[in-house]
Amino acid sequence: MFWPIVACVLLPWLLVYLGLHVVQRGIIFIDIAMAQMAALGICVAVLFRLELESWTTFGIALAFTLAGAGIFSVTGKRTSQIPQEAVIGIAYVVAAAAAVLLLSRAAEGDEEIKNMLVGNILLVTPREVWERFALFAAVGIFHFVLRRSFLLVSFDREGAYQKGLRVRYWDFLFYAVFGLVVTSFVRIAGVLLVFSYLIVPAVCGINLAQRTVNRLLIGWFIALLGGIAGLFLSYWWDLPSGAAIVCTFGALLILISLFALWQQHRVRSVAIQD
């Protein structure tokens, strides 16, 4: 349990930050679509009997993810008759179906489909944790250096256009780096857990705070709590770790949403009395 706990402590901080960007952009399902594209690349590697932790497998998965980054940056036009969420949904469904088709030809297809969805974070190794932590730290520094442009495009898209930013270029850069992070994490965590780490803590932070810094702090706490609690639940009750963490996140989101509604009702009641 030690290294899975270390992974749940060291790795989610960047996912929460990227999740805030995704939620503010209003393209919630882009993360699960990108994760599924990375998983499709891994399925290709499985079909050709490549080592899953090899650089070749990582390169194939990253190539599929970058293809998705290119598609989503092109389709995210300022004015378009087709909503980008429709393109994202289509990409996810096609990638998921293609993955199932590929794994149907693999010797251990059923097991790989399960790993693709929920991963097996209990089997994470020290090398996998430190490699991903180093990558996430590099991406975090990259985002910090370019934070003004990234934040402007995500949080004030019209303002970015008015200031003359090449929004499509910044979109591709964001999606490409985002895809790099997703590709590295999806192998140990699975598609559903990647989606949960990206979206649920960010939504919890938005429910409880207005300032971006406070949302990040709340999101980090929720990611830490949900990950560790889910791991212990899976250990005590002999449950799949990824699915247990996802369901724990769901329970936390329900509780926080109810608390946020109660808080809003309380504020309105006080305002009416005054």
Located regions from the model:
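Helix-loop-helix "hairpin" substructures at the membrane interface of multi-pass membrane proteins
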Residues: T125-P201
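Membrane-interfacial amphipathic/re-entrant helices at transmembrane-helix boundaries
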Residues: M1-W13, W55, Q84
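Loop-to-transmembrane alpha-helix initiation sites
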Residues: W55-L62, E85, G89, E128, ...
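Cytosolic-side transmembrane-helix boundaries in multi-pass membrane proteins
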Residues: I32, F48, G242-D274
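Short loop segments and helix-boundary regions at transmembrane helix junctions
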Residues: L20-A33, C43-G109, G205-L217, S234-W237, ...
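Transmembrane helix-bundle core of multi-pass membrane transporters
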Residues: T79-L146, D274
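Transmembrane alpha-helical segments in multi-pass inner-membrane proteins
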Residues: L192-A243
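Small-residue-rich segments of transmembrane alpha-helices in multi-pass membrane proteins
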Residues: A35-A45, I90-L102, L123, V167-V177, ...
